[in-house]
Each structure stands twice: as C-alpha cells, then as structure tokens.
Amino acid sequence: MNRSTLLLLLPVLTGLISCDGSDSTVSQDGEATPLILASQRGDLKTLAALLGQGSPPDVRDSCDWTPLMKAALNGHGAAVDQLLAAGATVDAEDKGGYTALMLAASNNHARVVERLLTAGAMADHQEGTQGWTALIWAAKQGHRQTLETLIRHRADPTLKDFSGRTAADWARETGHSGLVSLLEAANSGSSETNR
C-alpha cells in the first residue's frame, strides 16, 4: 500500500482500530454490546434474538459507532435491513461525523449504499474531519458501482471538502480517471436541474 492510499484511509482505519484506545465493542458506559458484535459479524440469528429481546438498535460503542454502522462497514445487507426495521437511525453520526452510508461507500458495498439511501440516508452529508461525503469516498477509492448508485440517488458532485476538492478532483488525483467523466456528466446534469 502506498503512502497516499494510506493517508486516504487513515480516518477510517483510526476509527476501526479505536478512537480512544478502548475496546470499540464496549458501550460508552463500559457494558459489553452483543448487538454491535452481532451486527459487525452479520450474525442474523443473534441480531434477531437481541432485537426481539428489546436491545436498543442505536446502542453506541466508545467511538460512537452504532450497530448499523458496523453492519454497513462490513457489507452485511440483511443485518442493515434488520436494524432499519427495528428503528435504527439511518443518519446517526460517530465522533467524527461519519455515517453508515459513508462507511458502506468507503468499502464499496453498493447494495448496502442502495438500501441506506432508499431508507432515507442523506446522500450529501459531510463528515466533520475532512468534509468528505459518501460520493467523495467512492471517487477516491475508485468504487464505480457505489459511485453510480450515489449519482442515481442524486448525490451532489459539486460539493467540496474542506480542502476545496470535489469528488471529480479526488478521482483524478487518485488515478481513477474512468470515474471523472461520470462525475462531470453528473455535474452538468445537476447544473441543468438547478437552473
């Protein structure tokens, strides 16, 4: 892995390792969170049992991650569906402002991205550390299918991150030239819609 790729992944990797040095499967009050573990693993049987026993679907770990975020990050679509049906907050944010949609997009889980958008996730939410959106994540990582899904759901290609770069700028900078034309076409389409 080269240095620029590592720098791109650093915010997510830091969150995955742990945001404060503690076990991220432990809730803020120190209690074990089996629902988060089941969601992370995509263990549908355990997930159904825990939700059926009244486990709150938006329990948080020490990094403010929810079960929905863990399921989305790992591409567990059926777990995402179960959590949403149980009332999980689709746009819950972690300590950095990341949402389940961003985490799914960063790992190219296009079907999970589709599910979250259909459930009402905000396509253009910007996280608080770099100002990245799900579309910027998909463009930076070269995730064509996820990028196309986001564009279909009208994600705004003109949004800029805190450094002033758009998704097309990131695609170009990270060597994903095939995505630049898609983003530019979406950009011209959104410009015409806004007239």
Question: Predicted regions: what is each one?
Answer:
Residues 27, 60, 93, 126-128, ...:
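Ankyrin-repeat boundary/linker signal
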Residues 57, 90, 123-124, 157:
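Ankyrin-repeat inter-repeat connecting loop/turn
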Residues 46, 78-79, 111-112, 145-146, ...:
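Conserved ankyrin/ankyrin-like repeat signature
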Residues 2, 11, 19-34, 119, ...:
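Ankyrin-repeat-protein effector appendages
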Residues 31, 64, 97, 130-131, ...:
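Start-of-repeat signature of ankyrin repeats
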